[in-house]
UniProtKB/Swiss-Prot annotation:
GO terms for cellular component: extracellular region. The presence of a 'disulfide through disulfide knot' structurally defines this protein as a knottin. The cysteine framework is VI/VII (C-C-CC-C-C). Expressed by the venom duct. GO terms for molecular function: ion channel inhibitor activity; toxin activity. Disulfide bonds join C43-C57, C50-C61, C56-C68. Keywords: Cleavage on pair of basic residues, Disulfide bond, Knottin, Secreted, Signal, Toxin. Belongs to the conotoxin O1 superfamily. It comes from Conus abbreviatus (Abbreviated cone). Its main location: secreted. The keyword Disulfide bond applies. This is Conotoxin AbVID. Residues 1-17 form the signal peptide.
């Protein structure tokens, strides 16, 4: 029974993946761009508000003024 359930779930996943990718090839570039934008980390420029040094592009944050150096 367990083997049948695993085979059924695998078949469902393969069918779903094939169906969803077939009709959405034109959106591939958009999805790729969205994924890249989420992976890219932005840093806070000089004099920007900061709470931790690693948010600043310079990796230095003034704790009293809460500004990047």
């Amino acid at each position: 029974v367990l083997i049948i359930a695993v085979l059924f779930l695998t078949a469902c996943q393969l069918t779903t993946a094939e169906t969803s990718s077939r009709g959405e090839q034109e959106h591939l570039a958009l999805r790729s761009t969205d994924k890249n934008s989420r992976m890219t980390k932005r840093c806070t420029p000089r004099h920007g508000v900061c709470f931790y040094s690693y948010f600043c592009c310079s990796k230095a944050c003034n704790p009293s003024s809460k500004r990047c150096l």
